[in-house]
From Swiss-Prot:
InterPro entries: Glycerophosphate_synth, TagF_C, TagF_N, Teichoic_Acid_Biosynth. It catalyses: 4-O-[(2R)-glycerylphospho]-N-acetyl-beta-D-mannosaminyl-(1->4)-N-acetyl-alpha-D-glucosaminyl di-trans,octa-cis-undecaprenyl diphosphate + n CDP-glycerol = 4-O-{[(2R)-1-glycerylphospho](n)-(2R)-1-glycerylphospho}-N-acetyl-beta-D-mannosaminyl-(1->4)-N-acetyl-alpha-D-glucosaminyl undecaprenyl diphosphate + n CMP + n H(+). It comes from Bacillus spizizenii (strain ATCC 23059 / NRRL B-14472 / W23) (Bacillus subtilis subsp. spizizenii). Pfam families: Glyphos_transf. It is found in: Cell membrane. Disruption phenotype: No effect. This is Teichoic acid poly(glycerol phosphate) polymerase. One of its GO terms (molecular function) is CDP-glycerol glycerophosphotransferase activity. Gene3D superfamilies: 3.40.50.11820, 3.40.50.12580. SUPFAM superfamilies: UDP-Glycosyltransferase/glycogen phosphorylase (SSF53756). The keyword tRNA processing does not apply. GO terms for cellular component: plasma membrane. Induction: The gene is not expressed under normal growth conditions.
Amino acid sequence: MKSKILMKYRSLLVRIYSIVFRIIGLLPRNEKLIIFESYSGKQFSCNPRAIFEYLEENKDKYDYQLIWSIDKRNKDLFDNSDVNYLRRFSLKWLWYMATAKYWVTNSRLPLWIPKPRNTTYVQTWHGTPLKKLANDMDEVHMPGTTTEQYKRNFLKEASKWDYLISPNAYSTEIFRSAFQFKKTFIESGYPRNDFLHKKNRNEEMLKIKERLGINKDKKIILYAPTWRDNSFYAKGKYKFNMVLDLESLKNQLCNEYILILRMHYLVSENINLTEYKEFAYDFSDHNDIRELYLISDILITDYSSVFFDFAGLKRPILFYVPDIEFYRDNLRGFYYDFEKCAPGPLLKTTEKVIEAIHKTKNYKQDENITSFYDQFCYLEKGDSSKKVVEELLG
């Protein structure tokens, strides 16, 4: 009974908020106001952050008010910084959001938020697609929705976007189909990857390792798997089953390597690494995955789009995919021949992963990896943020 009353109350509140938002949205735009958001306000990261940082660095040319929209549970990320922020769905947020000239976000906004007519909505998205997305998915296995409803809601939200940032021509064609997007693409490469092409990379790497308390004399392996649509606790909270044998990795690699874990932001697990102290570290809550890319010598992943970003560093990538047949045939499916074209070996056991790690000592880019780089990373030259800002603001 209580839950039904609560649901009705929330539904009424959302309706009222939406009406008020719509009314405020009729007022003139604040032409100098840009609202940023990353992963529904959970992070200060990704493409919105890179665009924000570029604008901050070029204040003389771009005199704008820059404000972040954040989830109240994550305000500690901003409390110790000079970044201006508003708590998502607060009354002040509602006013600023409804009157801002620009929205810059990397994931979908709630459907109940109406986009004012003269607001420019910039969708940066957050990855080069390997697994099928939105309208291209044959079947949706996520909690709290059906395939038809998921696609309908996704496309309704995508219809509000004015600009969509694409990392390459491959992604542009897929986004056009998956999101049914018919407005303006900015095919610029991903702004977030500008960080990986800084001139002072070695100096930056040392600073990051020192700040994170990581041994500077050991090589770093980054393990960054994705989530599984059909393995969840509730809507937006996904399970992760650690199949990779950390004990074996520690026993055979600890003298030379450190392992960093970075779970997907939708995964709810807290991985207990007590037994693997000084070998394995959980940096899932680390706000900026770009820093983890930069300090890592090797990436281990599965079907996560992180490998497209990491490939720009031209370092070894290993794919730990014990469930590849099920994932390919029953969950998402892939846009291209992953098994043939992946820029690294596909491995199904921890033993094979360890063997492959040892082989990276003689790592050389073969024709397959060079071809992959030329298809997916050719726009990543450190100037993507500049391209986006010039397209939007001149």
